[in-house]
Every structure is written in C-alpha cells, then in structure tokens.
Amino acid sequence: MLLSSSSSSPTNFNPNATYPRISKFAYLDPLELVIGDCEIGRLALVAPFAVCRGDEGTPIHIGDYSNMQDGVILHALETTSHGKNIDDRRYSAEGSLLKANNSEFKNGFAIYVGDKVSLAHGVQVHGPVYIGNDTFVGMNSFIFNANIGKRVAIGVSSTITDGVTIPDNKFVPPGSIIATQAQADALPPRVGSPYEKINSAVLHVNQELAKGYDARIIQRLATEIEGELEQEEMLQTGSPTGNPNVMARR
C-alpha cells in the first residue's frame, strides 16, 4: 500500500517528472520515502526510514517478495545526460551491463533488485547495481557498481564495488571488502556457511509482516469510511444509527 511518495524533479538528465509505481499488494511504512522512478513489487516490504530515490539514475526495480529493512538506501548514478545514454549505467533484467548504444538500454535498470531479496538494516545500494533473486545482503553492507548473483549471502558490514560480479550461490563473509574479480571468484559457497538458510527465514518474517500491516491498514480505513458514512447519515436524518463502534469513537 502506497503511503508516502513523490515525483522526481525535472532535470537536464531526467527531464520528465516520474512517480513511483507500487504494487497494491506491497507494504510501505508511513516513515519510508520513495521518490521518482522506483518500481516496487508484490508483497514487498519497505520498512521505516528506508529510502528509494529514483531521481538521478533510473529506473530502480525492487522485485516481488523482497524487503528493504530499516534505514536502507537505494540511489544510482545518472543514466542519461542531456538526452544521451551513458555507458555501463544500466543492467538488463537478466543481469547484463548495457552500453549506451545497446537497443536494450531504454529497458534497463540503474538498480535491479530481484525477487525474494533481503536488504537488511542500514544497507546502502548505489547503482549501477544488479542483485539476483533469493539473495541476502547483511546489515550495514555497501554495494556500488557491482553485479550480485542469485542465492548469494552477504555477511554484515561488507563492501562490494569496482565492477565485480559475485557468482551465484556464493557466501561473502562478514566485513569483507570485495573489489577485484579474483576476490569475488575465490569466495566460498553459501551452502555450508553460517548464512546458508538466513534468507528463507528473513523472507518468511517480512512477507508475513507485509500481509499483516496491509490488512491492518485496510481494516482501519474501512472502519473510518464506515464511520464517516454513518455520521453523514446522522446529519441527513437527525438521528443516531445505533452503531456502538461509531458512537464509541465520537
């Protein structure tokens, strides 16, 4: 449910104001901030103080069932300037880094966060970045200019940058700095690591929270609308409806 958002501001690199596109089945906390060209999928959860700024590098995609936990920041380097595309600033939905003259550039993403991805508290993702499905990014980690594969587990306070690609099914130990492809290729497997099953547990919790918070908000809105309708009826008829819930709220 979309609760707090705004359009981007027109600039020489993004001349058109763009509003976020949010699934009606996503949950966004009232204290989040989503600006501009951000797309958030079904049963995604955006927690308090999380920020998605689709006002410079665009667009930003957050897949179905993914979660942005408290204090997560998503932002990206500009993808176009004065109407011209910029090399290596967008990824395809399949994870290919795109050149400016690639016909797929217009359909690419400054940040692509796949389905069932967990971005834990305080994570910063600065595009160009690609994160594959079913990946966990641990608390206070930083990802900039990197391609993260599927089913990867990234330990807390890690840094991944300088154009590296983390292969599928890898484990990034806590506190790691991965800035060369040789470091990325030498990472151990996720299976058998302390983080082997962490994402499934985190996904379960956040999907339940998304459904629960959405249901609670819908019920509250329904109750408020019912009350407003009954108050309007009272004004028209001059007599109370007798609904004890409405009477109790007055």
Feature locations, PLM:
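Extended, small-residue-rich solenoid/repeat segments and analogous flexible loops
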Residues: M1-L43, V51
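Glycine-rich hexapeptide-repeat left-handed beta-helix
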Residues: L2-R21, D55, P59, G63-D64, ...
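Small cofactor-carrier domains centered on a conserved lysine used for covalent cofactor attachment
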Residues: A47
